[in-house]
Amino acid sequence: MLISHSDLNQQLKSAGIGFNATELHGFLSGLLCGGLKDQSWLPLLYQFSNDNHAYPTGLVQPVTELYEKISQTLSDVEGFTFELGLTEDENVFAQADSLSDWANQFLLGLGLAQPKLAKEKGEIGEAVDDLQDICQLGYDEDDNEEELAEALEEIIEYVRTIAMLFYSHFNEEEIESKPVLH
């Protein structure tokens, strides 16, 4: 069974890792959406979240399971089952912060997997620009929470769609080689 968001957060914090569960999910999603297919994801994760040090043994398995789950949901292009690993906190302001954290780390992972990402044009280039804007997502504590929650829901759906767009674009050969089952 996949570790819960809060349990993963606790384990990361206890181990002194520089990512929370949301940031970890965003980073791993970015690597996968960028087309990374080999085992280099683990050294990259260590490099960017733990000063090049391996994670404690007890943390490697749940992180690997999360990576595999993200990979599985991303590859289900037809089912669109991919979800952003955002905070379980119901507070709309915490959700907005979580989305911003996720998007920041997603872009980092995506950029590592696709070093020429900044040169992308068209739909992909626009999606990168949109994600950069989402990273800067701001709100005022006086904002209407209901309106913010509605806007946030739309942005989250848009980010899910963008992630699938990147995955489809940078993993084209893999998607095309999968047999269509009827």
UniProtKB/Swiss-Prot annotation:
The domain of life is: Bacteria
Which InterPro entries does the entry link to? Answer: YgfB-like, YgfB-like_sf
Can you supply one Gene Ontology CC term for this chain's record?
cytosol
What's one Pfam family here? UPF0149
Which HAMAP family does the record associate with it? Answer: UPF0149
For this chain, the family text in UniProt reads:
Belongs to the UPF0149 family.
Any idea what this protein is called? UPF0149 protein CGSHiGG_07585
